[in-house]
């Protein structure tokens, strides 16, 4: 894979670069495009009802001057894909990997990862889009500040881990990429797909040889809510931190992991920048969706 950077002079420009790539991917798999100033947006997933009301989405729609005509929430992919009212759909956990096989047209990023986080609908039908790969790449490149990490460690095995792995391979094709998760079977699938080393949490210190990764990424849901932090974290977090290294937590909430990383002297980014980039992609897709 050839190196492709999104990094620009500042954060807003980097987000715009991610949006351009996301739009271009959709146009590469469908002929013809149009524009729309209004949208009915659907959502599916554990936090979809909250996301549909969220400020980050509404800020992005306002920036693109898209009028939100309504929102609809569904409990499963069958209900979502069987409803004709919506023009754009947010696909959140745990459905990102389950929805992809049900959509005949996928963007290259969605096809490479098997992950769909957004569906855009036009006259030619529905297209499954992976905005998260572009958004996470924008976030990680911003956090690295133009430097190339010596190693990247991704914690987790769900849909987001696949998106982040693809983003790493686009930004830094030759980087040492490592994955660790309790679900070793799911972990092995994305590790093989993106030429990464992998192991369970217990073997991680040995694999790293006690050399913390330059860029540490948490794609797990630990830290997403107060309740999630009630259980012990699966990893020895202190052994993964090092002063001056980078920690990217996909969770928007300021979690205990982020606090620990800051106390260890790391450069820390929450998931908010990534979510702003994701929603910027979604709003732009709604504005310029296929007809």
Which residue stretches match the model-derived regions?
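Adenosine-phosphate binding glycine-rich loop
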Residues: 2-26, 64, 243-291
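Short, conserved loop/helix-junction motifs that constitute active-site signature segments
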Residues: 32-35, 145-148, 169-173, 209, ...
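NAD(P)-binding Rossmann-fold cofactor-contacting core
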Residues: 173-194
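Glycine-rich adenosine-cofactor-binding loop
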Residues: 45, 130-133, 140, 144, ...
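Conserved S-adenosyl-L-methionine
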Residues: 170-176, 264-267
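Phosphate/diphosphate ligand-binding glycine-rich loop within oxidoreductases
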Residues: 1-144, 254
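Conserved hydrophobic helix-helix packing surfaces used for dimerization/oligomerization
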Residues: 17, 38-42, 152, 177, ...
């Amino acid at each position: 894979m050839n190196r492709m950077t999104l990094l620009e002079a500042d954060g807003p420009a980097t987000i715009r670069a991610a949006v351009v790539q996301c739009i271009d991917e959709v146009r590469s798999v469908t002929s013809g495009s149009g524009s729309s100033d209004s949208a009915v947006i659907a959502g599916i997933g554990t936090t979809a009802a909250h996301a549909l009301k969220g400020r980050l989405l509404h800020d992005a729609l306002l920036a693109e001057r898209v009028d939100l005509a309504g929102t609809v929430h569904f409990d499963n992919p069958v209900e979502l894909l069987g409803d004709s009212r919506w023009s754009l759909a947010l696909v959140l956990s745990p459905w990102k990997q389950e929805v992809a096989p049900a959509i005949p047209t996928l963007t290259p990023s969605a096809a490479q990862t098997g992950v769909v986080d957004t569906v855009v609908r036009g006259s030619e039908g529905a297209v499954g889009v992976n905005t998260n790969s572009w958004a996470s790449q924008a976030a990680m490149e911003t956090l690295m500040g133009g430097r190339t990490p010596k190693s990247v460690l991704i914690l987790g095995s769900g849909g987001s881990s696949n998106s982040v792995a693809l983003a790493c391979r686009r930004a830094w094709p030759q980087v040492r990429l490592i994955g660790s998760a309790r679900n070793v079977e799911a972990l092995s699938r994305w590790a093989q797909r993106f030429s990464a080393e992998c192991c369970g949490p217990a073997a991680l210190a040995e694999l790293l040889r006690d050399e913390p990764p330059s860029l540490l990424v948490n794609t797990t849901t630990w830290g997403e809510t107060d309740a999630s932090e009630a259980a012990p974290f699966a990893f020895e977090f202190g052994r993964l931190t090092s002063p001056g290294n980078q920690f990217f937590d996909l969770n928007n909430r300021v979690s205990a992991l982020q606090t620990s990383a800051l106390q260890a002297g790391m450069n820390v980014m929450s998931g908010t920048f990534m979510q702003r980039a994701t929603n910027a992609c979604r709003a732009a897709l709604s504005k310029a969706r296929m007809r």
